């Protein structure tokens, strides 16, 4: 658990229900954050996923937000965490990070997808299948995002091959040479979008049952099944679908039992002529840490890479999204965004949504001036974006240790101290949350990261030469 003093404490708060005059400053900020989120994502999405968030305590510079189940927490984390972090930091300078946690017994807003599983762990929906016809939906319901269709996917040079493969699988699942379909590429480039598009297309025809889940949820669900002694049921459910899609497979690295289970499921499905679709951040051959036999099988079908976006593709995506929003965004602004935000489509989309939401709220058109003003913090962060990988590399070079020791289990001080410094710098220089940082350091827990941050702060106070080292690294990284 976190240390430190509790500065502000707040409880459940509905943006529409509380009068600002009767709330604490933190609650008032929360109302504004929620309103912004609502206007960015729309009423339906807000009600489905975000309304359940409950304001928790602010301890030192870390704010906790609660969700009633692990399923919801994971979903909100994967889809909205970055946005929540940015909105909070814009709202309150004293908040440096936002942590999403599960808290049982919160007032849960009724919603089909958010009930607890049979073991009360909130994991019952982490395996989700969507049968073709609504009446034949099993007790497992899927969050296939209706916005992620082939129609809304913009095709350009970097993604045309992956798009064509996805289309082909949606038209003719289990075709020879296309099973499994392995989609890979960097963060936020459209892998999940394509998987959902395949799922939506297939279920539309009415004859195919599709199961989609992240590898992380596959693992949680598998562990929950072991705990509740229902692994047979879990296996049967999985093996009864026509199409199984697993997103972000890299999460299974280092999870040997779960990999084993996935391998058997994979074989059973492919042998029965069912389709498997997998996404990951690297190609099968580069996914070191996955069992060889699984890697080999994953590479046996069609492997399609989604490359980083080009300027032309970014412009086409922005044009399409601006058009769909119904708000006029001048082409100068679109070009400006496409030049400035080159990392991934998720960020590009987030920036555009923010501009449009701002224009709607203040009732003024989008201009280059308002763009620079509204996106000030985002663009600034872009100018000096530092990645955790860069931090790990620089710190390892500085102390002359192996890069792999950043994620290894070695505890020798010569390795552990630089690792702690890298965690500290990751917290200071990136917007990543503690659990995200932990994951990048060999799947360590967020409390380990918290401890590292505190320890390095303490040491910097006590030892000036250590403090100089850390400051030097920080300056080099900030460029
Ligand atoms: N070519 C595209 N056309 C339209 N929208 C896109 C395109 N590529 C990505 N997007 C949008 O960008 C956002 C991020 O995409 P998505 O979640 O599919 O990325 P991802 O590759 O799965 O990322 P991650 O590695 O984080 O899982 C989504 O809102 C998606 O709709």
Curated annotation (Swiss-Prot):
Which Pfam families does this one have?
Bac_DnaA, Bac_DnaA_C, DnaA_N
Q: Which residues form a coiled coil?
A: none
Q: Where in the cell is it found?
A: Cytoplasm
Report residue spans for region: Domain IV, binds dsDNA.
360-479
Q: Where is this region: Disordered?
A: 106-137
The annotated region (Domain III, AAA+ region) lies at 143-359
- Keywords, alphabetical: ATP-binding, Cytoplasm, DNA replication, DNA-binding, Lipid-binding, Nucleotide-binding
UniProt cross-references to InterPro entries, sorted A to Z: AAA+_ATPase (IPR003593), Chromosome_initiator_DnaA (IPR001957), Chromosome_initiator_DnaA-like (IPR020591), Chromosome_initiator_DnaA_CS (IPR018312), DnaA_C (IPR013159), DnaA_dom (IPR013317), DnaA_N_dom (IPR024633), DnaA_N_sf (IPR038454)
According to the record, the segments passing through the membrane are none
Q: Where does ATP bind?
A: 188, 190-192
A GO CC term attached to the entry? plasma membrane
Start and end residues of each stretch annotated as Domain I, interacts with DnaA modulators:
1-94
The UniProt entry's GO biological process terms, in alphabetical order, are: DNA replication initiation; regulation of DNA replication
PROSITE patterns (UniProt xref): DNAA
List the SUPFAM superfamilies.
Answer: P-loop containing nucleoside triphosphate hydrolases, TrpR-like
- What is the similarity comment for this entry? Belongs to the DnaA family.
Q: What does this protein do?
A: Plays an essential role in the initiation and regulation of chromosomal replication. ATP-DnaA binds to the origin of replication (oriC) to initiate formation of the DNA replication initiation complex once per cell cycle. Binds the DnaA box (a 9 base pair repeat at the origin) and separates the double-stranded (ds)DNA. Forms a right-handed helical filament on oriC DNA; dsDNA binds to the exterior of the filament while single-stranded (ss)DNA is stabiized in the filament's interior.
- Annotated domain remarks: Domain I is involved in oligomerization and binding regulators, domain II is flexibile and of varying length in different bacteria, domain III forms the AAA+ region, while domain IV binds dsDNA.
HAMAP family with a match to the protein in the record: DnaA_bact
Q: How does it assemble?
A: Oligomerizes as a right-handed, spiral filament on DNA at oriC.
Kindly provide the name given to this protein in its UniProt entry. Answer: Chromosomal replication initiator protein DnaA
This chain's source organism reads Gluconobacter oxydans (strain 621H) (Gluconobacter suboxydans)
């Amino acid at each position: 658990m976190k240390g430190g003093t509790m500065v502000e404490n707040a409880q459940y708060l509905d943006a529409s229900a509380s009068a600002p005059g009767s709330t604490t400053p933190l609650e008032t900020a929360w109302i504004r954050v929620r309103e912004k989120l609502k206007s960015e994502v729309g009423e339906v999405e807000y009600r489905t996923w975000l309304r359940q968030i409950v304001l928790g305590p602010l301890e030192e510079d870390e704010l906790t937000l609660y969700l009633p189940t692990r399923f919801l927490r994971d979903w909100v984390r994967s889809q909205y965490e970055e946005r929540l972090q940015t909105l909070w930091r814009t709202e309150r300078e004293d908040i440096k990070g936002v942590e999403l946690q599960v808290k049982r017994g919160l007032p849960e807003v009724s919603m089909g997808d958010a009930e607890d599983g049979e073991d009360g762990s909130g994991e019952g929906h982490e395996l989700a299948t969507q049968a073709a016809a609504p009446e034949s939906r099993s007790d497992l319901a899927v969050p296939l995002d209706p916005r992620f269709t082939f129609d809304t996917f913009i095709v350009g040079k970097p993604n045309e091959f992956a798009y064509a493969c996805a289309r082909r699988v949606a038209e003719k699942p289990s075709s020879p040479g296309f099973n499994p379909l392995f989609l890979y590429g960097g963060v936020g480039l459209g892998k999940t979008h394509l998987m959902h598009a395949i799922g939506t297309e297939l279920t539309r025809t009415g004859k195919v049952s599709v199961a989609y889940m992240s590898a992380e949820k596959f693992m949680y669900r598998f562990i929950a099944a072991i705990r509740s002694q229902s692994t047979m049921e879990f296996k049967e459910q999985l093996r009864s679908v026509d199409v199984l899609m697993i997103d972000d497979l890299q999460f299974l690295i280092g999870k040997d039992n779960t990999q084993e289970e996935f391998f058997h499921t994979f074989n059973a499905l492919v042998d029965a002529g069912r389709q498997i679709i997998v996404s990951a951040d690297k190609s099968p051959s580069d996914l070191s840490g996955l069992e060889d036999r699984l890697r080999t099988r994953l590479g046996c079908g069609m492997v399609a890479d989604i490359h980083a976006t080009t300027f032309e593709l970014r412009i086409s995506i922005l044009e399409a999204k601006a058009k769909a929003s119904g708000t006029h965004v001048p082409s100068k602004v679109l070009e400006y965004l496409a030049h400035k935000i080159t990392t991934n489509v998720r960020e590009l989309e987030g920036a555009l949504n923010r501009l449009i939401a701002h224009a709607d709220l203040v009732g003024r058109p989008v201009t280059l001036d308002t763009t620079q003003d509204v996106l000030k913090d985002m663009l600034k962060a872009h100018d000096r974006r530092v990645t955790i990988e860069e931090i790990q590399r620089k710190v390892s070079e500085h102390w002359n240790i192996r890069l792999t020791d950043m994620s290894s289990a070695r505890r020798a001080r010569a390795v552990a101290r630089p690792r702690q410094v890298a965690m500290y710098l990751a917290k200071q220089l990136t917007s990543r949350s503690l659990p995200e940082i932990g994951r990048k350091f060999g799947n360590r827990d967020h409390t380990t990261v918290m401890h590292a941050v505190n320890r390095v702060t303490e040491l910097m106070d006590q030892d000036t030469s250590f403090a100089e080292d850390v400051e030097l690294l920080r300056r080099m990284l900030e460029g």
